[in-house]
Design a protein with these regions (language model features):
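Exposed extracellular interaction/assembly regions and N-terminal maturation sites
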Residues: 2-77, 99-115
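A conserved acidic, glycine/proline-rich C-terminal tail/linker
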Residues: 78-87
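Extracellular disulfide-bonded cysteine-rich modules/repeats
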Residues: 90-101
Length: 115
């Protein structure tokens, strides 16, 4: 299955004496069984029975995940909210997470089931 991205936002990054232009995708529609974050602001999960999203703290600091299917969210290191190895969210739920000092925290959610 494919990954659909919205039109990219163009970024110019200045580092030392170099200028690098990047295309930055902020919204992503995922219809795969597994996906690892790449710095998106919003991921919408749909068109699969179950999906697993891995939060990559090297590329992503803050993210919202809206799911139209069952979804399991796992961190790349540590635990979510210092307690959970993973969180499971059901169809129609939305959760916002932020990485602070290497720990992923749930900032807001609807329909989060902490199993």
């Amino acid at each position: 299955m494919s990954i659909l991205r919205e039109t990219p936002i163009r970024k110019t990054v200045f580092k030392s004496n170099r200028t690098v232009n990047l295309n930055d995708f902020k919204t992503l529609i995922v219809n795969k069984d597994f996906y690892s974050t790449l710095g998106e602001d919003l991921i919408i999960v749909r068109d699969v029975t179950q999906s697993k999203i891995k939060l990559d703290s090297k590329t992503t600091e803050r993210i919202k995940i809206k799911t139209l299917t069952n979804c399991v969210i796992i961190p790349d290191v540590g635990k979510i909210d210092e307690d959970w190895d993973e969180i499971s969210i059901g169809r129609g739920a939305c959760v916002e997470l932020q990485n602070i000092n290497g720990v992923w925290y749930v900032l807001s959610s609807d329909g989060v089931k902490m199993d």
